Amino acid sequence: MKQPFQKRIHADTLILIAAAVLLVLFAISEVYPKVNDAALPKPLAARCLLLVLVCLISYLGGLLRQMRTGDRRLTEWLLTAYFILYVYLLLSLTLMDETLRLDPSRLESAGCTKREYYMKWFVNFRPFDSIWRVYVQGFMDGRINFGYMVLNLLGNLCAFMPMAFFLPRLWKLQRRWYVFLATVVLSVAAVEGMQLVLMVGSCDVDDVILNAGGAFLFYLILKIPPLARLCDAVWTGNFAG
């Protein structure tokens, strides 16, 4: 007598389903407040943690699928999707966050146009001026604490660091240091330019210096042979070589 057909669900499939559920939850948390005009807090740490969790779980599922089938296309597709998610999060934090918009009450008391106010208080074209005046002098004068200074400077240094992993593996031309550096500088400058046009956040040449400098430093670090081999293994899913 024939046994009834039973379809086996592999562990990698269950893991990928779990990652998909978490991704849906992330998407809902991003869209729901905008649809309902609700001032729901979306802490940066929680958003980043959820997105990192999605990436780690889905990568594990893709790796197990590759080990089972020998097909690495899913792993490479997932890593490309992670790059897209990273770019979305970056643009969301720099251009679309409601906290970046000017406070209308300040404009009323300033007695000037929105553009004039923004250009006066949120634009800096002098290299290292904000780093020195806002952070170093601010810390020395007691206006900001050490933790705030370090967190903001490190945040700017780390913001574009993932580019050092993704760009050279997505496009071979980006493996040349000068091409990578030019791409990152232009990308950061484009974001700062959009902030200037949209009048959100601050348009600051020091952000270009810190963002691009951090990305290029990480690029050089990942060029160290053991780290370069590890990054290639992560990208291909082949840790045996």
What do these predicted ranges mean?
Residues E192-Q195, D207, N211:
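Active-site scaffold segments
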Residues Y178-V179, V205-I209:
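Hydrophobic alpha-helical membrane segments of integral membrane proteins
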Residues K2-M199, Y219-G241:
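Bulky hydrophobic segments
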Residues L157, M161, V208-A215:
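Alpha-helical transmembrane segments of multi-pass membrane proteins
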